[in-house]
């Protein structure tokens, strides 16, 4: 897979304590764009691939978005990429300084093309210190960009924005490990509202699959087989970094009552997008039962119900026949002497 970098620049954000005790991020701006080289394209390819594998939120620009106005000027060639990057860096520094997770870092702004799609990528990368051995076999300190682990990043699908103004997914951002606050920051920085909700889309997909099997009058074993087909397809999409294509998924499934899954989903109006970002945590319920509470965590394959695992609804209990060997060994080691 090849990537074409059109324009790229790096700036620095430096964290300092302000006189009022709050955090302040100062910008150190580069005077010119980076020259496109094999190293630059390799950097962006690795950032693109790392971004693809991260959990993302989706948004759309508000009408009053300052960032969107600056971006539109760039796309209409009313300004160049370098001055656009200056405005973006200052805006990001101002907004990020309002949050406790703000840190210094290298700001990457890049306009690139991947698989016939144009993107604008924005990320704040931190630097790590490591050691190297020089040509004289001496140990030296060195700094490197941490391009595999980053939380502050957003990407705009410029092709989608240009061709489909009503899209609810052209703007994405990493949700990050610090929860909702990262989403709040990006909404403020980009001047955006929430767009596509992947959680809702995945839940609606699960409901559509269950209803499809029910209207097809499948028995439990047949239903579980269809759900496993769905999960296997979705797992493959996750592993390859791709989204769930509704039409493609439909081709993997049997036709029931002379209707394909795609036709059934459209007729019932589940509100499913043609392409859905997969969420492993939600999709695993296709083939597993799991739950936790009151000090107990249980997870098992759905096909084991009424075989090795018996559910008694009236007694509110599960009976497990054939414990996992490692659990049985722990019980013997730790509890036998107590009896």
From Swiss-Prot:
InterPro entries: Nucleoid_associated_NdpA. It comes from the Bacteria. One of its GO terms (cellular component) is bacterial nucleoid. Pfam families: NA37 (PF04245). Keywords: Cytoplasm. The keyword Chaperone does not apply. Its main location: cytoplasm. It is found in: Cytoplasm, Nucleoid. GO terms for molecular function: double-stranded DNA binding; single-stranded RNA binding. The keyword Cytoplasm applies. Belongs to the YejK family. PANTHER family: NUCLEOID-ASSOCIATED PROTEIN YEJK, PTHR38772. This is Nucleoid-associated protein Asuc_0779.
């Amino acid at each position: 897979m090849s990537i074409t970098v059109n324009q790229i620049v790096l700036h620095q954000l430096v964290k300092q304590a302000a006189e009022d005790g709050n955090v302040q991020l100062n910008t150190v701006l580069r005077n010119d764009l980076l020259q496109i080289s094999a190293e630059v394209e390799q950097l962006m390819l690795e950032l693109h691939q790392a971004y693809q594998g991260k959990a993302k939120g989706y948004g759309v620009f508000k009408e009053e978005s300052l960032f969107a106005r600056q971006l539109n000027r760039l796309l209409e060639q009313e300004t160049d990429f370098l001055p656009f990057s200056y405005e973006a860096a200052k805006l990001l520094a101002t907004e990020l300084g309002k949050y406790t997770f703000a840190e210094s870092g290298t700001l990457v702004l890049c306009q690139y093309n991947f698989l016939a799609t144009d993107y604008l990528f924005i990320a704040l990368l931190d630097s790590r210190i490591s050691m190297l051995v020089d040509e004289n076999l001496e140990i030296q300190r060195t700094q490197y960009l941490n391009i595999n682990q980053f939380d502050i990043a957003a990407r705009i699908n410029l092709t989608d924005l240009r061709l489909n103004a009503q899209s609810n997914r052209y703007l994405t951002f990493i949700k990050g490990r610090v929860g909702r606050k990262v989403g709040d920051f990006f909404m403020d920085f980009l001047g955006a509202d929430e767009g596509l909700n992947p959680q809702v889309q995945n839940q609606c997909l699960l409901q559509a699959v269950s209803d499809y099997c029910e209207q097809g009058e499948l028995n439990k074993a047949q239903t579980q087989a269809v759900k496993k087909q769905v999960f296997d397809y979705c797992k493959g999409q996750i592993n390859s970094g791709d989204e769930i294509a509704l039409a493609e998924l439909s081709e993997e499934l049997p036709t029931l009552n002379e209707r394909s899954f795609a036709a059934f989903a459209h007729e019932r109006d589940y509100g499913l997008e043609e392409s859905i970002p997969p969420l492993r945590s939600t999709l695993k319920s296709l083939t597993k039962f799991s739950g936790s509470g009151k000090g107990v965590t249980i997870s098992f394959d759905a096909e084991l119900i009424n075989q090795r695992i018996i559910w008694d609804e009236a007694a509110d209990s599960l009976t497990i026949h054939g414990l996992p060997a490692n659990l049985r060994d722990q019980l013997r080691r730790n509890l036998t002497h107590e009896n």
